[in-house]
Amino acid sequence: MATSRATVVPMKMTQMKAAQVPNPGADFQIVECEIPRPDAGHVRIKVQACGVCHSDVLTKEGLWPGIQYPRVPGHEVAGIVDELGAGVSEWKKGQRVGVGWHGGHDNTCRECRRGDFRNCRNQKIAGISYDGGYQHYMVAPVEALVAIPESLSDVDAAPLLCAGITTYNALRHSGAFPGDLVAVQGIGGLGHLGIQFANKFGYKVAAIGRGSENAALAKKLGASVYIDSTSTTATAAEALQKLGGARVILATAPSSKAMSALIDGLGPNGKLMVIGATFDPIEVTPVQLISGSRTIQGWAAGTPADSQDTLRFAELTGVRPMIETYPLERAAEAYARMMSGKAQFRVVLTM
């Protein structure tokens, strides 16, 4: 993987700056470019904050097919409507809006016609299909927009538009009921939000982390129980079984080995809900699934309507991301911090 240095590329006198990836695996470039104009059905957003998500590696390293370069990453965008394209009437200039992973859909494929916009065959993704939020201004289709509640700051709202919606949406579609034992694997960028949401949903939350030093934070975030996966006394799966077996395990840390080791911690009809993305296979035997009618399901983000639900729920319950902020000009440093796994816990660019 290329190192994350940024070079400044001078261009003609223009009006905004952007942090772009010129080619797959290349260093970030801070460039000057013209402020884009919105086409019909689009709006221009004056970006106030943009989260730096692990999924940005797809753009940075060219791991998503069909990306056209240079490309500006960023799909956790919070800003203000700056200009309306032709035919846009449902949004107003000056309105606070956000754009998440779901950057648009075609409305014509089988999934869209059935209302399953999350699985649109031709889904657009901000920062992949078109330039994202690592810049002062960006253009997005109206179907990608979500209104940001006034009580949420831009830096708090931005991570909720990907990390937040992913954990919130996965949990509310997991089949768990209030009072059920729900385990959250990992206390990081996704996990620290998953613990908060699970607590507010009324679940009995077991947080699974590495090392006893994470116990206090897990309890502060809302966990009833902390399980140290490095303990030599009992495995995490055994610890869950002593609690009766988990109805749901929300797997947030991208470690297939760790996920595989937790399957035996599921109770009857238990579900391993996977949101931590990795290309390595999860190892499971048919007997593990058949015994107790266990299932494994993946979940990816959601629609702007789901984002709206996430923001409203966070507004009402006080769920907030823990963040570190960097100015746009330090995008390379912010990205490297995120990739190091040492950030506490979401990294956000500010404009």
What are these language model-derived features?
Residues 181-187, 199-261:
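Adenosine-nucleotide cofactor-binding segment
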Residues 34-50, 63-110, 144-152:
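Glycine-rich beta-strand-centered segment in the early N-terminal region that forms part
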Residues 203, 253-325, 351:
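Glycine-rich phosphate-binding loop and adjacent beta-alpha segment
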